[in-house]
Amino acid sequence: MQNLLPYIKNNLNPMLAQILLQALQNSNNEKFFTFVLENIEMICTWLNSSEFRDKYLSTKHPYPPLINPEFIETDASRHCAELAWDLNLPLPQHYKFIYISPHGVGAAAFLRYLNQCCDVICFASWCLPADAKERYCAHYMCLNDNAISQYAINISEVNIPYFDKYLSLLDFDSKIICGVRDPIGILKHCWGRDWSKVLRNYPSEFNLTYDWRYYIHYLTHKSNEIKINIEELQQGSFILSSLLKHFNKDKVYYLDMEEISQSKALNTMNSLAFKFDFTPPHNEHLALFRIKEFRGYIRYLFPITLYANSKDIHNTFYLNTPKNNKNFNTDKISSIPVILDRKHINPQKIDIIQEIIKNDLCDDMGVYIDKDDFEKVKQNELLFSTIKHYLRDFLHEIKITIDETESKMMKEKDVIDYFEKNKSLIHTFFNIFEDELSHLKQKCPNIIASWKYYNKFLKLYQG
């Protein structure tokens, strides 16, 4: 480093030197320091070039690349990804699009369609580490992986470390799919659900002796007091105004949540596949379009695994034998795993739910068993009938509970009623909505006009 500083001083003007020194100061990656030492001449040549001046200095790019991103050899390794981050290299630009999804606009359903029906890999941002560098590295490795032919990037929150740098390393001219929804519906989603369910405080594995009513208790909805946190809403649910300034707004396509409802989703995905050049939904995956993503709280219950074992048959829990002898030592080795999960495609497993129940719950979940295990369990009629009886009772109660939850859950009308009773909040949220929806109003006034409850809110504001 002692020899590096004089070289930088002699070969870069103070402004360019500060760019390089700031990057070194921001990193704790020894491999980055070594790279700079070994390639300092190339770095200085690039920083002094007219191309660097015209592309990055004149545009006041906050994180300009320290080497020419057009002439580098890279791969899908973690090493290259971390080095690229420290060098401020933009992410490779061959992702199909960026999907901006404020909390509550149907992102879970849309991402399911992309990943499972259209062969587009797009990780839900809320499942990635809450660190912009880690997200950048994950995307960088995937975009350099030759085995991944269709990739998209999801952004659904803004309150993560180094997020400004992350955004600056995305292409300004990226194609954008921006999820939107009647903001009263967004508030209903945020205020009306018990988000403590996300913590999943229940065992994920059980056996035939387990009292499944504990899961039913978890699924049971409890109305909670509305707690308004404006900062939290603006970091997760009303994020468009802060995000879109980082991109070319002419490249933004607005996707109203209504267009991915169960009746419209298939046509919408076919249309988007043509517009954004990705694989349209496969015919064999059409059952996935019948899923209601947020039906009660089953989204947060599954997956759970029943380990079915003949040794537990005589102590199986039923509603009429609640004081059965519980087996707290589940034998995973000699048991057959039966997985309760949301509906999905897995060629290695068989979904046996329709051997257990025949109602609309079959659209939203499956009961999965390995093909080899299915052949085994069919040979053991007593075990198979016990599994089906145990799960039939369990699934029956699941349906009752989630249907009751749906009926009790907050509705858009309840949000409007809340504003009528708390008029002091109307002006605050009017300003939030105006800021959030300013570009949408210019580009897609038809979407705004279709929002029944937002327009009711405007009438409240107007008095």
Q: Predicted segments — roles?
A:
Residues 1-90, 278-463:
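PAPS-dependent sulfotransferases, especially Golgi type II membrane carbohydrate sulfotransferases
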